[in-house]
Design a protein with these regions (language model features):
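Vicinal oxygen chelate
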Residues: 1-6, 36, 47, 59, ...
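Short, solvent-exposed beta-strand edge segments and adjacent coil->beta transition regions
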Residues: 8-12, 66-70
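A short beta-turn/loop motif at secondary-structure boundaries
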Residues: 41-44, 65, 99-100
Length: 125
């Protein structure tokens, strides 16, 4: 069985964060992201970045305070991803839990305030 529902992509958000560099570091450590692009403002501050996670790209914009977004991401092993995210500096929102909706899901909050919901499909809905 696939680790995600047929036709789903892993992730496709645009996040506004206070610190693009810190978010990219977290995405690499927690989810194995690969940096794709980084654009700067005329004063040299980061303006926009892109990173690939699995089969998808997450885009980041730098904005003071960020937006506190929530992102759902399908992963092959939610327990391993949860552990990697905590090791990368995230705080736990929810330990991996099967709530009967077909997914095993955990929740972590990164240093920029984004809450990530890594999930692995347990059964076809």
């Amino acid at each position: 069985m696939a680790y995600k529902p047929e036709g789903y992509t892993d992730i496709s958000p645009y996040l506004l964060v206070a610190d693009i560099a810190a978010t990219l570091d977290f995405l690499e450590a927690a989810f194995g992201a690969t940096r794709l692009r980084l654009h700067h403002r005329p004063n040299g501050d980061p303006m926009h970045a892109e990173a690939r996670i699995g089969d998808s790209v997450v885009m980041l914009g730098q904005a003071p305070g960020g937006d506190g977004a929530h992102v759902h991401i399908y992963v092959p092993d939610v327990r391993a991803t949860y552990a990697a995210a905590l090791k990368a500096g995230a705080t736990s929102v929810q330990e991996p839990l099967d709530q009967g909706d077909g997914d095993l899901r955990a929740g972590v909050q990164d240093s920029q305030g984004t809450i990530w919901w890594p999930s692995t499909q347990l059964s076809v809905r």
